[in-house]
């Protein structure tokens, strides 16, 4: 479970609701739960974070020097670094969320930023690329950061659309620096969440060529796959009848009987099975 993709879960107007949700998850589900935030979290608020479920805190800091220009309305990096310290003192495993990596900025700040995060108690770093639109590029041009980004783009972003900025070298650099400083390094937030919970990554990064090679060792923690459970899940959740179920290495192969209107269900069913079984899933439709 990830909190923070749409809005900051610890914004003062939302913190109470966020804690209510986390308590409910702790009481009834126990899902590994991750949140990303830029908000200051003080000792009293940190103590309210439920301990009955694995919690992976990500604290977003992308710059120390240009925070006032890039994020004028957000709390400064000093407050966020203090949040890392407080969360660590409460027994959690906070990580620096270094996303997005901004070309032309991160190269000069990377060493200091990761050093500060470690000094304040971060156990790892999660990296991620920048995505830009035309309006974002215009805003970045006002502080002289659009040039290095445009140099990496093959063409102008489409009207109304976002495009990822190629950043493989920056990701590798950030992960290398983090490891050199004794921190864990993750290519994706889901990997950090899985590491904290001690479970295989739900996005199957280890099977899709996106593994961070962290100490979690997902392959050693894969759950057993029972044919009966697969059949029941498809029937009860999606109304699909499994004709054949087989496991070949890391891939689960399922033949499902064709029926009217099933096209919209197949992708959802495949994704649900992948999360449940932690295997790559191939669904093949067969006629009766």
What name fits each language-model region?
Residues 140-288:
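C-terminal accessory extensions appended to soluble enzyme cores
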Residues 1-170:
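Conserved AdoMet/S-adenosylmethionine-binding subsite of the radical SAM
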């Amino acid at each position: 479970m990830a909190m923070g993709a749409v809005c900051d879960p610890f914004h003062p107007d939302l913190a109470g609701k966020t804690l209510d949700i986390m308590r409910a998850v702790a009481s009834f589900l126990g899902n590994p739960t991750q949140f990303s935030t830029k908000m200051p979290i003080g000792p009293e608020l940190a103590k309210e974070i439920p301990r009955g479920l694995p919690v992976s805190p990500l604290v977003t800091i992308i710059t120390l020097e240009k925070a006032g220009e890039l994020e004028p309305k957000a709390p400064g990096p000093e407050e966020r670094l203090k949040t890392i310290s407080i969360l660590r003192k409460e027994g959690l495993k906070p990580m620096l969320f270094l996303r997005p990596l901004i070309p032309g900025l991160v190269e000069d700040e990377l060493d200091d930023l990761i050093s500060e995060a470690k000094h304040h108690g971060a156990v790892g770093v999660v990296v991620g690329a920048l995505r830009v639109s035309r309006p974002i590029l215009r805003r970045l041009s006002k502080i002289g950061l659009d040039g290095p980004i445009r140099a990496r783009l093959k063409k102008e972003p489409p009207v109304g659309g976002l495009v990822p900025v190629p950043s493989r070298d920056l990701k590798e650099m950030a992960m290398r620096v983090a490891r050199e400083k004794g921190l864990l390094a993750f290519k994706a937030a889901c990997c950090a969440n899985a590491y904290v919970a001690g479970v295989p990554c739900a996005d199957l990064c280890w099977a899709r060529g996106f593994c961070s090679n962290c100490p979690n060792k997902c392959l050693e923690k894969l759950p057993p796959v029972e044919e009966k459970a697969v059949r029941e899940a498809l029937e009860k959740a999606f109304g699909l009848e499994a004709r054949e179920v087989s496991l070949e290495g890391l891939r689960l192969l399922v033949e499902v009987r064709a029926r009217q209107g099933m096209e919209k269900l197949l992708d959802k069913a495949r994704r649900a099975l992948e999360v449940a079984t932690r295997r790559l899933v191939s669904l093949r439709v067969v006629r009766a």
